[in-house]
């Protein structure tokens, strides 16, 4: 389906993994889009108008239709633009991709980053709890080039935008090697494979800028 850039608009924030994964999906499918950078602190009238429920990015505007929440947007993109499928066709495999994506956003993010930043139980305890979660993903990607198999898919976009190109830079800023190669060889191999994909590289935020951004996030978490 040929689209013009003005038909597809994405409101996002440069350091947001939720925004990055949507951009990866657009690039994977070759969909032209207009990107509108948002200030997530001083939210624009446009953002508040089109996403009054969550008041956050990303937001997709397509031919007057508005969608928020990255998982919802990714599924919608996959249904509208059929080329280079993101989700598996098999119902069970599709359900499992959605399951693990939810696991990444709802379990890995809060435990592996927020808990470590707060360190209420001590940093070492928090790291141990986080690494127990990563072991599930280590097993899930074992023997595969990507979570999606030979090509990147839904879970690769979700986990890839969140773990190596967001959380890992936060851990780096805290001086923590959360996913050491000797303990997680499969995850590290997967990360290397991701970095070889052009559309992924195009969507990765600048490393040093993101590390500084994540340091500020850590300070906000600690002071909350």
UniProtKB/Swiss-Prot annotation:
Localization per record: Cytoplasm, Cytosol
GST C-terminal domain location: 90-217
GO terms (BP aspect): glutathione metabolic process; positive regulation of defense response to insect; toxin catabolic process
Segments traversing the membrane: none
Keyword match Transferase: yes
Record has S-adenosyl-L-methionine as a keyword: no
Enzyme class: transferase
Family of the protein in this entry: Belongs to the GST superfamily. Tau family.
Protein's name according to its UniProt entry: Glutathione S-transferase U4
Classification lineage: Eukaryota, Viridiplantae, Streptophyta, Embryophyta, Tracheophyta
Protein's gene: GSTU4
């Amino acid at each position: 389906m040929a689209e013009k850039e003005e038909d597809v608009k994405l409101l996002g924030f440069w350091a947001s993994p939720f925004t990055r994964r949507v951009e990866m999906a657009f690039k994977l499918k070759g969909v032209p889009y207009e990107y509108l950078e948002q200030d997530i602190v001083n939210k624009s009238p446009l953002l508040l108008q089109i996403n009054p429920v969550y008041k956050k990015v990303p937001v997709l505007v397509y031919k007057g239709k508005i969608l928020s929440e990255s998982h919802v947007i990714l599924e919608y993109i996959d249904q509208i633009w059929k080329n280079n499928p993101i989700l598996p066709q098999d119902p069970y495999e599709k359900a499992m991709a959605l399951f693990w994506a939810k696991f990444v956003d709802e379990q890995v993010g809060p435990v592996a980053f927020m808990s470590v930043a707060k360190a209420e139980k001590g940093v070492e305890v928090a790291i141990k709890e986080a690494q127990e979660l990563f072991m599930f993903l280590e097993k899930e990607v074992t023997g595969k080039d990507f979570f999606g198999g030979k090509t990147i898919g839904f879970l690769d976009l979700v986990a890839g935008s969140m773990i190596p190109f967001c959380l890992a830079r936060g851990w780096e800023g805290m001086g923590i090697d959360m996913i050491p190669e000797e303990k997680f060889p499969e995850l590290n191999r997967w990360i290397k494979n991701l970095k070889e994909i052009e559309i992924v590289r195009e969507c990765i935020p600048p490393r040093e800028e993101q590390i500084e951004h994540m340091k500020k996030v850590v300070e906000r978490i600690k002071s909350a």
